[in-house]
Amino acid sequence: MGIGVNTDLPRNEQIKAPKVRVVDENGKMIGVMPTRKALELAREKGLDLVLVAPNENPPVARIMDYGKYKYQLTKKQKENKKKPVQMKQMKFRLKIDEHDYQTKVKHIRRFLEDGHKVRVVVMFIGREMMFAEKGKEILERVIKDTEDLATVESPPKMEGRDMWMVLKPKNS
Protein backbone atom coordinates (compact mmCIF):
# COMPACT_ATOMS: atom_id res chain seq x y z
CA MET A 1 0.00 0.00 0.00
CA GLY A 2 1.73 3.18 1.25
CA ILE A 3 5.42 3.76 1.11
CA GLY A 4 7.06 3.75 4.53
CA VAL A 5 3.92 2.60 6.38
CA ASN A 6 3.59 -1.06 7.28
CA THR A 7 -0.10 -1.89 7.03
CA ASP A 8 0.30 -5.63 7.66
CA LEU A 9 1.17 -5.81 11.35
CA PRO A 10 1.20 -9.27 12.99
CA ARG A 11 -2.08 -9.85 14.81
CA ASN A 12 -3.87 -12.46 16.89
CA GLU A 13 -2.43 -15.94 16.17
CA GLN A 14 0.36 -14.48 13.98
CA ILE A 15 2.08 -13.16 17.12
CA LYS A 16 4.89 -15.60 17.96
CA ALA A 17 6.27 -13.93 21.12
CA PRO A 18 5.54 -15.87 24.35
CA LYS A 19 4.89 -12.66 26.35
CA VAL A 20 3.74 -9.21 25.28
CA ARG A 21 3.29 -5.80 26.91
CA VAL A 22 -0.39 -5.03 26.40
CA VAL A 23 -1.99 -1.63 25.75
CA ASP A 24 -5.79 -1.49 25.72
CA GLU A 25 -8.02 0.16 23.11
CA ASN A 26 -7.94 3.47 25.02
CA GLY A 27 -4.13 3.61 25.06
CA LYS A 28 -3.88 2.58 28.74
CA MET A 29 -0.99 0.26 29.68
CA ILE A 30 -2.31 -3.04 31.06
CA GLY A 31 1.07 -4.72 31.62
CA VAL A 32 3.17 -7.71 30.58
CA MET A 33 1.31 -11.01 30.19
CA PRO A 34 1.45 -14.24 28.18
CA THR A 35 0.30 -13.80 24.58
CA ARG A 36 -2.50 -16.37 25.07
CA LYS A 37 -3.99 -14.37 27.95
CA ALA A 38 -3.73 -11.10 26.00
CA LEU A 39 -5.44 -12.74 23.02
CA GLU A 40 -8.30 -13.95 25.27
CA LEU A 41 -8.64 -10.42 26.67
CA ALA A 42 -8.92 -8.98 23.15
CA ARG A 43 -11.45 -11.64 22.09
CA GLU A 44 -13.64 -10.90 25.14
CA LYS A 45 -13.89 -7.31 23.93
CA GLY A 46 -14.54 -8.43 20.33
CA LEU A 47 -11.28 -6.83 19.15
CA ASP A 48 -7.90 -7.90 17.75
CA LEU A 49 -4.49 -8.11 19.41
CA VAL A 50 -2.04 -6.29 17.11
CA LEU A 51 1.74 -6.30 17.53
CA VAL A 52 2.68 -2.62 17.15
CA ALA A 53 6.32 -2.67 18.38
CA PRO A 54 7.82 -6.12 17.67
CA ASN A 55 11.43 -5.04 18.38
CA GLU A 56 10.79 -4.00 21.99
CA ASN A 57 11.51 -6.33 24.89
CA PRO A 58 8.89 -7.62 25.53
CA PRO A 59 7.08 -6.73 22.27
CA VAL A 60 4.21 -4.23 22.57
CA ALA A 61 0.76 -5.40 21.47
CA ARG A 62 -2.34 -3.23 21.32
CA ILE A 63 -5.96 -4.28 21.62
CA MET A 64 -7.82 -2.62 18.73
CA ASP A 65 -10.26 -3.12 15.88
CA TYR A 66 -7.75 -4.03 13.13
CA GLY A 67 -10.22 -3.56 10.27
CA LYS A 68 -11.07 -0.05 11.46
CA TYR A 69 -7.34 0.74 11.93
CA LYS A 70 -6.50 -0.42 8.40
CA TYR A 71 -9.42 1.56 6.93
CA GLN A 72 -8.32 4.76 8.71
CA LEU A 73 -4.74 4.22 7.54
CA THR A 74 -5.72 3.89 3.86
CA LYS A 75 -8.09 6.87 4.23
CA LYS A 76 -5.23 8.98 5.65
CA GLN A 77 -2.92 7.91 2.80
CA LYS A 78 -5.51 8.92 0.18
CA GLU A 79 -5.96 12.27 1.94
CA ASN A 80 -2.21 12.90 1.86
CA LYS A 81 -2.11 12.22 -1.89
CA LYS A 82 -4.84 14.80 -2.49
CA LYS A 83 -2.98 17.68 -0.82
CA PRO A 84 -2.82 20.58 -3.26
CA VAL A 85 0.44 22.05 -4.52
CA GLN A 86 1.25 24.97 -2.29
CA MET A 87 3.02 28.15 -3.26
CA LYS A 88 6.03 28.65 -1.00
CA GLN A 89 7.95 31.90 -0.84
CA MET A 90 11.61 32.69 -0.24
CA LYS A 91 12.72 36.29 0.29
CA PHE A 92 16.19 37.62 -0.48
CA ARG A 93 17.75 40.97 0.30
CA LEU A 94 20.10 42.68 -2.12
CA LYS A 95 23.05 42.35 0.26
CA ILE A 96 23.03 38.66 1.11
CA ASP A 97 25.97 36.74 2.55
CA GLU A 98 27.08 33.60 0.67
CA HIS A 99 26.15 31.23 3.51
CA ASP A 100 22.69 32.79 3.85
CA TYR A 101 22.23 32.49 0.08
CA GLN A 102 23.20 28.79 0.15
CA THR A 103 20.82 28.11 3.05
CA LYS A 104 17.91 29.77 1.24
CA VAL A 105 18.67 27.86 -1.97
CA LYS A 106 18.72 24.63 0.05
CA HIS A 107 15.23 25.47 1.35
CA ILE A 108 14.03 26.28 -2.18
CA ARG A 109 15.39 22.92 -3.39
CA ARG A 110 13.56 21.13 -0.56
CA PHE A 111 10.28 22.88 -1.45
CA LEU A 112 10.71 21.88 -5.11
CA GLU A 113 11.51 18.26 -4.17
CA ASP A 114 8.28 18.20 -2.14
CA GLY A 115 6.39 19.28 -5.29
CA HIS A 116 5.67 22.89 -4.28
CA LYS A 117 5.94 25.97 -6.46
CA VAL A 118 8.31 28.60 -5.09
CA ARG A 119 7.97 32.36 -5.40
CA VAL A 120 11.45 33.86 -5.10
CA VAL A 121 11.45 37.53 -4.09
CA VAL A 122 14.29 40.06 -3.93
CA MET A 123 13.27 42.98 -1.70
CA PHE A 124 14.67 46.46 -2.32
CA ILE A 125 14.83 48.82 0.67
CA GLY A 126 15.52 52.55 0.43
CA ARG A 127 18.05 53.49 -2.23
CA GLU A 128 18.62 49.86 -3.25
CA MET A 129 16.07 50.49 -6.04
CA MET A 130 18.94 51.94 -8.09
CA PHE A 131 20.54 48.46 -8.18
CA ALA A 132 17.68 46.50 -9.75
CA GLU A 133 20.21 44.79 -12.04
CA LYS A 134 21.88 43.21 -8.98
CA GLY A 135 18.49 41.83 -7.90
CA LYS A 136 18.02 40.28 -11.34
CA GLU A 137 21.48 38.68 -11.01
CA ILE A 138 20.44 37.07 -7.71
CA LEU A 139 17.29 35.63 -9.31
CA GLU A 140 19.24 34.34 -12.32
CA ARG A 141 21.73 32.71 -9.96
CA VAL A 142 18.83 30.97 -8.16
CA ILE A 143 17.56 29.73 -11.54
CA LYS A 144 21.01 28.35 -12.35
CA ASP A 145 21.38 26.70 -8.92
CA THR A 146 17.97 24.97 -9.17
CA GLU A 147 17.87 24.18 -12.91
CA ASP A 148 18.09 20.42 -12.25
CA LEU A 149 14.85 20.53 -10.20
CA ALA A 150 12.86 23.48 -11.52
CA THR A 151 11.66 25.38 -14.53
CA VAL A 152 10.74 29.06 -14.50
CA GLU A 153 6.97 29.46 -14.53
CA SER A 154 7.05 33.25 -14.59
CA PRO A 155 10.28 35.10 -15.37
CA PRO A 156 11.72 37.81 -13.08
CA LYS A 157 9.56 40.93 -12.99
CA MET A 158 9.54 44.12 -10.97
CA GLU A 159 6.50 44.90 -8.82
CA GLY A 160 6.71 47.89 -6.48
CA ARG A 161 9.84 47.48 -4.35
CA ASP A 162 10.11 43.74 -5.08
CA MET A 163 11.49 41.75 -7.98
CA TRP A 164 10.07 38.26 -8.13
CA MET A 165 9.73 35.08 -10.17
CA VAL A 166 8.00 31.72 -9.76
CA LEU A 167 9.76 28.35 -10.03
CA LYS A 168 7.84 25.12 -10.49
CA PRO A 169 9.10 21.54 -10.11
CA LYS A 170 10.15 19.90 -13.39
CA ASN A 171 8.03 16.80 -12.78
CA SER A 172 4.74 18.74 -12.62
Swiss-Prot record:
GO cellular component: cytosol
GO terms assigned for molecular function: ribosome binding; translation initiation factor activity
GO terms under biological process: ribosome disassembly
Compartment(s) of residence: Cytoplasm
Source organism, top-level taxon: Bacteria
Keyword Protein biosynthesis (UniProt): yes
Key words, A-Z: Cytoplasm, Initiation factor, Protein biosynthesis
Listed Pfam families: IF3_C, IF3_N
Subunit structure: Monomer.
PANTHER family cross-referenced by the UniProt entry: TRANSLATION INITIATION FACTOR IF-3, TRANSLATION INITIATION FACTOR IF-3, MITOCHONDRIAL
Family the entry assigns: Belongs to the IF-3 family.
HAMAP family the UniProt entry points to: IF_3 (MF_00080)
Function, as annotated: IF-3 binds to the 30S ribosomal subunit and shifts the equilibrium between 70S ribosomes and their 50S and 30S subunits in favor of the free subunits, thus enhancing the availability of 30S subunits on which protein synthesis initiation begins.
Protein name, per record: Translation initiation factor IF-3
